[in-house]
Design a protein with these regions (language model features):
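A bilobed periplasmic-binding-protein/Venus flytrap-type ligand-binding module shared by bacterial periplasmic
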Residues: 145-152, 267-280, 299
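Early extracytoplasmic/lumenal segment of secretory-pathway proteins
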Residues: 32-105
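N-terminal secretory signal peptides and thylakoid transit peptides that target proteins
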Residues: 1-17, 28
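Ligand-binding pocket segment of bilobal, Venus flytrap-like solute-binding proteins
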Residues: 178, 182-185, 189-258
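A structural signal for short loop-to-beta-strand junctions that line the ligand-binding cleft
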Residues: 91-96, 114-146, 162, 173-175
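Periplasmic-binding protein-like
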Residues: 171-178, 290-314
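Ligand-binding "clamshell"
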Residues: 107-115, 127-134, 242-257
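An extracytoplasmic/periplasmic, membrane-proximal ligand-sensing/linker region
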Residues: 197-199, 306-352
């Protein structure tokens, strides 16, 4: 069997979630390439990560500066979380990196992450972007907001996620399906703000507007640019990436829910925690602390046009151009607590 240098696909067997597959990235140069996970004390940290964009360069820099090798296995948040649970004390994972606070919160609730005492992390990561029990820490901020084609929509016509339920947007919306954690966490945040009855009313309004559902934020924006829709909900950094490659990309962003008294735009995180049974705990903590520094933050957030969690870190100039925003200060643990409620609500409202 020929194995590519880039990826080795691992079937999860009994530990898998339906149809999930993970890829073990064979990182170049200083990184292990497909070898078994190193034992404790071997100068390595093993990561299960759903964040895969641009991480190789970040981890290479960490290895050059510390001598600690990084190995990571990539896959979806829920699949990786289930794998850690199934592997129990035998898991090779030292760290779990997720792109959704809800899944980090669920991992902590399931006992998969250990509490960490770190002056550096407490100083570098604001309290609202980390678990109060220090089981996980936000590393970047991901803002989910409203995007539009300026030739067909004026920014003044847009205001909130809830207002997209207005019939004026019938046949004009492009959105992510209910199966994705981005949609689930947005709806969970709305349940926290409004309760289930009001949130279901909004979601039913979205459904009545017959949105085009596409399971890729990049593709959503490309469809918007090509005239296949007028308004979309995506994460901000997808537009940042497209503008990086094409500064004339014809889609604009507006920050949702910014009116006085409103809660602010939906902010999620990519974040990480150290697994309960980590064999290389000290190396994992060193990596977490390194990423939380202004230098680590610039590399980790800038590689994917995300906002740094550390306010002392510089913001990528493209997304700095999006202007200031006020984010929802919801306790991010609520995204995990309300995830199942959000999924049931989406199903009841026939949002697929």
């Amino acid at each position: 069997m020929k194995v590519s240098r880039r990826n080795l696909v691992v079937k999860l067997g009994a530990a898998s979630v339906a149809g999930a597959a993970l890829s073990v990235a064979a990182l170049p140069k200083a990184f292990a390439q497909g070898a078994p996970a190193a034992a404790a004390g071997a100068g390595v940290v093993n990561i299960y990560s759903s964040r895969h964009y641009g991480v190789e360069g970040v981890f290479e820099t960490f290895t050059r500066e510390t001598g600690i090798r990084v190995r990571f296995t990539s896959g979806p948040d829920a699949g990786l979380r289930e794998r850690i649970r199934a592997e129990g004390r035998h898991t090779p994972a030292d760290m779990f990196i997720a792109v959704d606070a809800g899944n980090l919160a669920l991992a902590a609730t399931q006992g998969l992450l250990q509490p960490v005492t770190s002056t550096a992390l407490s100083s570098n990561i604001p309290a609202h972007l980390r678990d109060p029990g220090n089981h996980w820490f936000g590393l970047t901020q991901r803002v989910r907001t409203i995007l539009f084609h300026p030739a067909r929509v004026q920014a003044a016509q847009l205001s909130t996620f809830e207002a997209l339920a207005d019939p004026m947007w019938r046949g004009r919306l492009v959105m992510r399906p209910a199966t994705h954690s981005y949609t689930q966490s947005l709806v969970a945040s709305m349940i926290a703000a409004h309760g289930e009855a009001r949130t279901e009313q909004v979601v039913r309004g979205w459904v009545a507007n017959n949105p085009q559902l596409i399971d890729s934020d990049t593709r959503i924006l490309e469809v918007l640019a090509a005239g296949g829709g007028d308004v979309a909900i995506t994460n901000h950094y997808y537009l940042g990436r497209l503008l990086q490659s094409n500064p004339a990309f014809p889609v604009r962003l507006m920050w949702a829910n910014q009116a006085a008294g409103d809660r602010g735009v939906h902010v999620n995180i990519s974040g990480a925690g150290i697994t309960t049974h980590a064999q290389n705990r000290d190396n994992a903590l060193r990596l977490l602390e390194w990423i939380s520094t202004p230098r680590g933050q610039e590399l980790f957030s800038g590689s994917n046009h995300e906002y740094p969690a550390n306010p002392a870190a510089p913001v990528h100039p493209i997304i700095a151009g999006f202007g200031p925003f006020r984010g929802d200060r919801l306790d991010l643990r609520e995204l995990g607590r309300l995830q199942a409620d959000a999924i049931r609500l989406l199903d009841r409202a026939a949002y697929r």
